[in-house]
Amino acid sequence: MEKKATIYTATGDNGTTSLVGGTRVSKNHPRVEAYGTLDELNAHLGLLAASIDDARIVAFIEEVENNVMTIGCELACEGNKMPTVSKEKITSLEREIDKLEASLPPMHEFILPGGGEAAARANLCRTVCRRAERVMVTVNGICQVPQESMVYINRLSDYLFLLQRFLYNGKEKKWEKPCK
C-alpha cells in the first residue's frame, strides 16, 4: 500500500530543518532566516498585487515574486545547485525603476508611509525587502551569496519605494520635522 504524502514530517520538531542537500541546521540559522524573510516578502508582494488594479504593474510584481522565490531557493540550497537571478532580470528591474522615477516629481523631503492601501502595502514590502537584504549580508559572511541576488534585492527595495510613491498618486504626506 502506498503511503499518503503529508505536510508534516515531524523532523523539525526539535528546532532543526534541512537545507536542500540534506544538511540539518537550526531553524534560526541565518540561511533559514534569509529564505524565510524572502518567503514573507513574497506573501506581502502577493497582497500588494491583489490591491492594485493596473495589470502591467501586477504582471511585473508576479515576475518579481518568481525572482524572489528563485533567490530563496538558492539560499536554501547547499553549494551552487540552484540557478540565480540573471543579469537580465536585474536590468529589467532597473528599467522599471527608471520608468517610475521618470514619472515622479523629485523628492526633497522624507515622506510618511500610507497613501492608501496599495501604497502602504508597497511600503511594507520595501521594509521586509530591506530586512531580507540585511539577513542576506549576514549569510554572505558565512557562505557566498551570488552577487546578482544581492544586487537584485537591493534594487527591489528601490523599486518598491518608488512604487509606493507612484501609488500615492501625488498625495504624499511629508514628514513634519525634516532633518536639517
Residue ranges and their predicted role:
Residues 1-180:
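Phosphate/pyrophosphate-binding loop motifs in nucleotide- or prenyl diphosphate-using proteins
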